[in-house]
Each structure stands twice: as structure tokens, then as C-alpha cells.
Amino acid sequence: MAVKIRLTRMGSKKKPFYRINVADSRSPRDGRFIETVGTYNPLVAENQVTLKEDRVLAWLANGAQPSDTVRNILSKEGVLKKFHDSKFSK
């Protein structure tokens, strides 16, 4: 089972916000998911992001692949740097 970390659209028409979910790559965008690991609100000025960093790092360590947008969000929040440092530190 290929697992992805991706965005699920919530909110009303013209006012979206997104949940950052871990889901099977074959399930639909707003369909079944395994776990919610954060939220993303693009409408506020500073693009509000909340993350459960420990869970995101655990899923990345288990092989979950982030989507392009989620990869950018995780990079801006510094989570990918922590993952890289923990993976390649000796």
C-alpha cells in the first residue's frame, strides 16, 4: 500500500481550508484517510499551518511520500530539514 501525505479540501465555496492527511494513494482526494496530521489555511495573510510534527516525522520515516504542495509546506515549516538530519546523522 503506497501511502501519501496530501491535502484534503474542506470549507465552503470560495473559502477553502485544507487538512493535511495521510491516505492510501489510490483513495480519492476527499475520501478515506488514515490519519490527520495538520491543517493549512491559505486565506489568512501568513498562511496559517498547524502540524503534529512527531506524527509527520513518523510517517515520513515509514515511507510516506508527501505531495508537491505538502512538501513545500513541510519545507517552509522546517520539518523536512529535521527529517533529513535525523535520517543522515551518524
From Swiss-Prot:
Keyword annotations of the record: Ribonucleoprotein, Ribosomal protein
Protein name: Small ribosomal subunit protein bS16
GO cellular component, one term: small ribosomal subunit
Family to which this protein belongs: Belongs to the bacterial ribosomal protein bS16 family.
Lineage: Bacteria, Bacillati, Bacillota, Bacilli, Lactobacillales
Keyword Ribosomal protein (UniProt): yes
NCBIfam families tied to this protein: S16
Molecular function in Gene Ontology: structural constituent of ribosome
